Amino acid sequence: MVKIPFLFLAALLLTAAQAASAQAVIDTTGGRYYRPVFANVTVASGVAYGAAVNSAGINQTLLMDVYQPTSDALARRPVIVFAHQGGFIAGSKTDAYMVSVCTQFARLGYVTASIDYRLLDFGTIIGGGFDTVNIAKSAIRGMQDLRAAVRFFRKDAATTNTYRVNPGYVIVGGSSAGAFAALEVGYLDKVAEVPGYVGIAALGGVEGVSGNPPATAACPRPCST
């Protein structure tokens, strides 16, 4: 007979304690990272982050657009690197969705980047090469290029510090095919995990050769992981 009121009182006290704890949370960022505290964004277009041979056998310069909150004085900012959609055959760093999402996150206080990465070339597609093998290779190239962009920012943080990013807070993301590439960056770390028909070793392995080599004095470990 006494247990029910006691349990009710205990639950009431627990609820009150949780409410008090929630009220005691202190906002240490002034709304940064979850509210658009910056009205304007500054964009550096066409920043070269690497180069690599594409599916057409041409050495392609890899470019990205970097978005930063205007008049931001913070010394070290987290950076989010985005890869666009398009099924590894189409799309661009300037796609409307990429521009929108990069702008929105930059207004929250992040440094953001939208990258162009190597796509399956049109000649291969119309020549009958639009198949599982070539799409898989394009997915690997996209992952390698995204890794190169991550290495670019970590190398920059260790050298010129142009973009003032925190090398410990580098985030990758994307839309559709770009999201797939981001998942590969996060979870694919062994050549043995890739089907043999892809021939990943000939493509440059997991890290790739798209730029900013993973083993340098500034970054003695694979910089993209």
Model-predicted segments: where are they?
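Bacterial Sec-dependent N-terminal signal peptides
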Residues: M1-T28
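N-terminal cap/lid segment of alpha/beta-hydrolase-fold proteins
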Residues: A24-A75
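Coil residues (strongly favoring Ser/Thr
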Residues: T28, S100-T103, T132
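Short beta-strand element of the alpha/beta-hydrolase
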Residues: A75-G86
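Serine-hydrolase catalytic-loop signature spanning alpha/beta hydrolases and amidase-signature enzymes
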Residues: G87-A90, T112, F152
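Cap/lid segment of the alpha/beta-hydrolase catalytic domain
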Residues: F88-Y97, D116-I140
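Short amphipathic alpha-helix adjacent to the substrate-entry channel of hydrolases
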Residues: T94-S114
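Primarily recognizes the serine-hydrolase "nucleophile elbow" in alpha/beta-hydrolase
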Residues: A148-T225
